[in-house]
Each structure stands twice: as structure tokens, then as C-alpha cells.
């Protein structure tokens, strides 16, 4: 079975990502996130580049906040400056020193909020965030469970049944993950009827849950029992996670089969 792949690229000072762009003020930020890996007590610098592609100068205040109730970011990061003035058509760096606390475990996550005013007549206050992840080397715990699989029918605009698959996952580890979620549907003879990926990759923070959904428009199922298998892949640290569920199709209705009956 494919082993788990987390979709992150760790570099010493930066990772290459598409920039964040806010058309309201003509601001873009690159990269759209940083993911760094440090040993306890280790320090480094990270840099974001803010570009003003608008027609007016912008004054930006940087305000880091803990994300998902994790350690206070001011315990492990220091801004070179909490304010940056960017002239129209120019760019400016945001430099941040990060230091892994000696007692840190798993991962620290901060959201760096860029606060400024809309340069249009509305003068609205704008607050955009870019994340900073710091993984603590040697303390990572990768864990993931599939809590539930559910299959239902819903009527579409043509009054025909569409199939809906819901997979609820739970990050039981202490670092964020970006799982690749796939589902496989087989008939009672084991023939593969459908293979599909669920949504685009989503970041699931430690201790958090996420629901993935798949819609299959106007499938045809004969009456009978079917098996749906969900498979989650991420970094090569643990084996893939999978779970099966069965459902019964009868007279254009779907009923989930309890796991004890399904033999799971």
C-alpha cells in the first residue's frame, strides 16, 4: 500500500509557493506560507515579500496570532518590525526570527495578519493572514483516523439520484497534515465501479477534524450491496489509513449497513 505523503516542502529559509493576492488593495504576499523544521533551541530567519501592485502607497501592520489555540507565537517568533510601508509598484520584506522552545513538542503554528486600509474610497479595514508552521524535529507524531463514512442519494435538478459520499477524518497527531483522500466503490463481486479523489487537498491541523465530500452525478446502481473504501495517504512516516463501509441499494434508496452486519 502507498505510504502516507504530506504535501509540504521544507527548506532552510523559504518554500516556493504561489503568492497571496488581495485585489482590494493591490497587495500580494509570497510565499503564501512558510513551513520550517527546527530542533529544540534552534533558530533561523524567515522572510515574506509584500508587493504593492496598486496605485497608492499602503501602510501595513503585522500582527501574529496563535492558530488553533497553539503556543503563543510571541514565545517563539520575533518580528524585525511590526509595520511596513510599501509604495505603489514596490515591494518590501517582512523578516521574522523564529526559535524553537526547548520544551516545544510537535508543531507551532502562527497566522501572520497583515492589517491595512482599502485604498479605494470605502477605506475599509482589511486583515489578511499568511501562516507560519514550525515543526519541532524529533517530536513529530503523525496520526490519522477515519471516523465515519456515509453514502446517500439526493435528487438533482432532473429528479435523478446523485450519489454523495462523506468521509470524516480526525488528525490525532501533533503536526498538521495535508492528506490525499481517495474513495473506491465496488459491487458485491468486488468489481471496481468508481475511483475518485475527494476535493482538493486541505490542511488539517493537529487535534482537528475535517469532512471530505464526493458527488457522483446520476450513477446507475442495481439493487444489491456495495462497498466503499476510503484511503488516506500522507508522508512516509506511517502506513496508509483505510476504512470500509457497506451500503445497500433497494428501490432507488440507499441504506448504510452497520459495521457488525458488514463483517468489519
What residues fall within each predicted segment?
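Asparagine-centered strand-capping/turn motif at beta-strand->loop junctions
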Residues: 50-54, 100, 169-173
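Beta-sheet-dominated interaction scaffolds and their linkers
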Residues: 23-53, 83, 144-162
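Intrinsically disordered, low-complexity Pro/Gly/Ser/Thr-rich segments with frequent PxxP/GP/PP motifs
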Residues: 75-103, 191-221
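Bacterial N-terminal signal peptides that target proteins for export
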Residues: 1-8, 19
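C-terminal segment of classical bacterial N-terminal signal peptides
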Residues: 13-22
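Surface-exposed binding patches on compact interaction domains or structured appendages
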Residues: 26-31, 53-96, 180-183, 187-192
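Short, solvent-exposed loop/turn segments enriched in Ser/Thr/Gly
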Residues: 30-32, 40-47, 92-94, 105-112, ...
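Terminal connector regions
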Residues: 53-68, 102-139, 219-264
Amino acid at each position: 500500500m502507498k505510504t502516507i505523503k504530506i504535501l509540504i516542502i521544507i527548506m532552510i529559509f523559504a518554500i516556493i509557493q504561489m503568492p497571496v493576492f488581495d485585489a482590494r488593495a493591490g497587495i500580494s504576499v509570497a510565499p503564501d506560507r512558510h513551513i520550517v523544521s527546527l530542533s529544540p533551541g534552534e533558530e533561523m530567519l524567515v522572510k515574506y515579500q509584500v508587493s504593492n501592485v496598486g496605485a497608492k502607497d499602503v501602510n501595513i501592520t503585522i500582527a501574529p496570532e496563535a492558530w488553533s489555540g497553539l503556543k503563543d507565537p510571541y514565545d517563539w517568533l520575533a518580528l524585525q518590525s511590526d509595520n511596513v510601508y510599501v509604495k505603489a509598484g514596490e515591494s518590501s520584506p517582512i523578516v521574522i526570527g523564529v526559535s524553537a522552545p526547548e520544551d516545544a513538542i510537535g508543531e507551532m503554528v502562527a497566522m501572520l495578519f497583515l492589517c491595512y486600509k482599502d485604498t479605494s474610497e470605502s477605506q475599509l479595514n482589511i486583515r489578511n493572514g499568511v501562516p507560519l508552521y514550525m515543526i519541532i524535529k524529533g517530536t513529530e507524531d503523525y496520526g490519522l483516523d477515519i471516523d465515519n463514512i456515509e453514502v446517500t442519494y439526493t435528487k438533482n435538478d432532473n429528479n435523478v439520484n446523485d450519489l454523495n459520499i462523506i468521509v470524516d477524518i480526525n488528525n490525532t497527531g501533533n503536526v498538521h497534515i495535508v492528506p490525499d483522500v481517495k474513495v473506491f466503490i465496488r459491487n458485491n463481486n468486488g468489481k471496481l465501479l468508481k475511483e475518485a479523489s475527494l476535493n482538493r487537498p486541505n490542511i488539517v491541523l493537529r487535534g482537528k477534524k475535517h469532512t471530505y465530500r464526493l458527488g457522483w452525478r446520476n450513477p446507475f446502481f442495481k439493487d444489491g450491496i456495495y462497498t466503499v473504501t476510503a484511503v488516506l495517504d500522507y508522508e512516509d512516516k506511517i502506513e496508509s489509513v483505510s476504512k470500509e463501509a457497506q451500503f445497500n441499494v433497494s428501490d432507488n434508496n440507499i441504506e448504510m449497513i452497520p459495521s457488525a452486519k458488514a463483517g468489519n
